[in-house]
Regions:
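Conserved N-terminal alpha-helix of the aminotransferase class I/II PLP-enzyme fold
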Residues: 41-76
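PLP-dependent class I/II
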Residues: 1, 5-9, 15-33, 64-403
Length: 403
């Protein structure tokens, strides 16, 4: 949808990257090392000083004793981290449980690993989606009652059923892209109990670990009893330090798993960029005040954007973490969310992602916006979205004429 946004000159709230700069200390360090390096390969699983700084940071936030030599592989973004982790623990013919909605790469990673995905619905507070779950052939067991549901939730029985069917691992995106769910400690314990019972693994995607809105708290499932041995934690520096283009990610896991991840990683990309690791090491050493400021900054952006949507009478998911909202466009008679997003970019001037990209179920009434933008960018987008209701009348007429 970035291409569509560029085509029509729309404000791009589709692809999840910020339009503000990384912390100056990081970019200053990059400028310092540009003349003299490092410019050649680092150790394939990550430069020593980078891994040491990362181990110290993550040990601080998780309370775990993470060894920089035994428990870390540095990857080219969390995308590679997830692929390497999947190929490490999953064999051809295995199955992998994935919550729906989901970041689209998870399905591809599963298939490329020779495994089969099993989808577990996260049920949001919309009756339209509840009905979609009920009639989806792939979600016959996921039917939900017609009562209102307070937040995204899951049926633990469906997780257990997935492992009964042979799931080797479960993918956990927490906080969740696209729905913004932050899993509670109790929910994570429920997942952990099932995974332990069936001798499985959890592969996490925790790239938004520091973007969580009060009163919610991020809990690392690897810290629960019995889960360090069964968790392959994937994350990156992209969102935390606003360096999505630097492609610096990592895997944290027990030594017996990391030894195998190293081998897979070596044949996927060899190693992450040495000068970028050197520069980013500065960020890994930031004090707690940086992460508190980051959370405050994102809370401000969330309030600015969501308050604007509320003023227009629009219905959307209220994120607990990450930086996405899913807008309910069912009142405009939307049957094809891709077509609607193309229309939105052309006629309203704001880019969004069709919600159906993230769902296994038959869901076409949601579109995803992200709000990791400067105030002036968000305000300009809101100014354009203020005309959505009036302009949508032409869209509705178009849809009627198509019928």
């Amino acid at each position: 949808m970035t291409r569509i946004s560029n085509k029509y000159g729309a404000i791009n709230l589709s692809q999840g990257f910020p339009d503000f700069d990384p912390p100056k200390k990081i970019t200053d360090r990059l400028a310092e090392i540009a003349p003299h390096g490092p410019h050649q390969y680092a150790i394939t699983w990550g430069a020593q000083n980078f891994r040491e700084a990362l181990a110290k940071k993550q040990s601080h936030f998780t309370g775990l004793d993470i060894d920089p030599d035994k428990n870390i592989v540095v990857t080219c973004g969390s995308t590679e981290a997830m692929m390497a982790s999947m190929m490490t623990v999953v064999n051809p013919g295995d199955k992998v449980a994935i919550f729906s909605p989901f970041y689209e790469n998870y399905t591809a990673d599963t298939i490329l690993s020779g495994a089969e995905p099993i989808y577990i619905p996260l049920v949001p507070p919309t009756m339209a989606y509840s009905r979609a779950c009920s009639r989806s052939e792939d979600s016959k067991q996921a039917s939900v009652s017609s009562r209102s549901i307070a937040a995204f939730s899951f049926d633990a029985n469906l997780i257990e059923e997935a492992f009964k069917q042979g799931a080797k691992a479960l993918v956990l995106c927490n906080p969740s892209n696209p729905c913004g769910k932050v899993f509670t400690r109790e929910e994570l314990q429920t997942i952990a109990d099932i995974v332990i019972r069936y001798d499985g693994y959890v592969i996490t995607d925790e790239v938004y670990e520091h973007i969580v809105y009060a009163p919610h708290k991020h809990v690392y499932i690897s810290t629960l009893p019995g889960m360090w041995e069964r968790t392959i934690s994937c994350s990156s520096l992209s969102k935390t330090y606003s360096i999505t283009g630097w492609r610096l990610g990592y895997v944290i896991a027990p030594e017996r798993i990391i030894d195998r991840v190293k081998k897979v990683h070596d044949f996927l990309t060899v190693g992450a960029a040495a000068p970028l690791m050197e520069a980013a090491t500065v960020g890994l050493c930031f004090p707690d005040s940086y992460y508190e400021g980051l959370q405050a900054h994102y809370t401000h952006m969330k309030h600015l954007f969501c308050d604007g949507l509320r003023q227009f009478g629009l219905e959307f998911t209220d994120p607990e973490g990450a930086y996405y909202v899913m807008l309910d466009v069912s009142k405009y008679g939307v049957n094809d969310d891709l077509h609607f997003c193309e229309w939105l970019a052309e006629h309203v001037g704001v880019g969004a992602v069709p919600g159906s990209c993230f769902f296994k179920e038959d869901v076409h009434h949601l579109v995803r916006f992200h709000f990791a933008k400067r105030d002036e960018t968000l305000q300009a987008a809101l100014d354009r979205l203020s005309a959505l209701d009036s302009k949508a009348k032409t869209y509705q007429c178009t849809e009627v004429n198509k019928i």
